[in-house]
Regions:
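Minor-groove-contacting beta-hairpin "wing" of winged helix-turn-helix DNA-binding domains
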Residues: 55-57
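Short acidic/glycine-enriched loop/turn segments that link adjacent beta-strands
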Residues: 50-53, 119-123
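Extended serine/threonine-enriched, polar tracts that run as long, contiguous segments within proteins
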Residues: 114-117
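Glyoxalase I/VOC metalloenzyme domain signal
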Residues: 1-47, 59-112, 127-181
Length: 181
């Protein structure tokens, strides 16, 4: 996805994306291998944070300069979904052909996976790796005006877009979005 550029904010001050992602895992090697072999991340630093080994990876091939910190943690309980946990980590590919190529690699390694799914606004594949992290890989957004609403300057003016398969749950989803902790 391209960054949202507006006249009111010069590009050098714009928020372009998420800074770092920290993945706390028991076994670092399987996750590191996926980042390097499947997504093109490069290991660029290692250090200790208290008693934990941390390995830093960077993706230099795009505007966002994504960075992932893998923290080795053999002591903490395995993460469960809920407050403080993440459901999945998402990556992008250039097109459907790249996604199909990645899907073949995933199936060759026998990762538990979803297969390729049409999500209306993008096409995705999901798989779980050895540390039980769920990886999503998606094509770029389909920029069809009928499917995706225009971006607005004010966040509260953007209508909630749901794919057709979730429309029957719209009321419940909107209620949960408005939930205050």
């Amino acid at each position: 996805m391209d960054p949202f550029i507006t006249e009111g904010i010069p590009e050098e001050y714009a928020i372009l994306g998420i800074g770092d992602i920290h993945l706390r895992v028991r076994y670092t090697e399987p996750t590191q291998k996926i980042l390097e072999d499947y997504y093109g991340f490069k290991k660029y630093n290692k250090f200790k944070f208290y008693d934990r080994k941390v390995t830093l990876f960077r993706f230099e091939e795009n505007l966002f300069k994504h960075e992932i910190h893998i923290i080795e943690d053999k002591d903490s309980a395995v993460e469960r979904n809920g407050v403080g946990g993440i459901h999945h980590i998402a990556f992008g590919v250039k097109d459907i052909e790249d996604l199909k190529e990645l899907q073949e690699k995933i199936e060759e390694k026998n990762y538990f996976n979803s297969g390729i799914k049409n999500r209306e606004f993008m096409i995705s594949s999901y798989f779980r790796e050895a540390n039980h992290l769920l990886f999503e890989t998606a094509t770029p957004l389909i920029k069809d005006k009928k499917i995706i609403p225009e971006q607005k300057n004010n966040f509260d003016e953007i209508p909630l877009f749901l794919p057709k398969f979730l429309e029957n749950r719209r009321e419940r989803i909107e209620k949960n979005i408005n939930f205050k902790f």
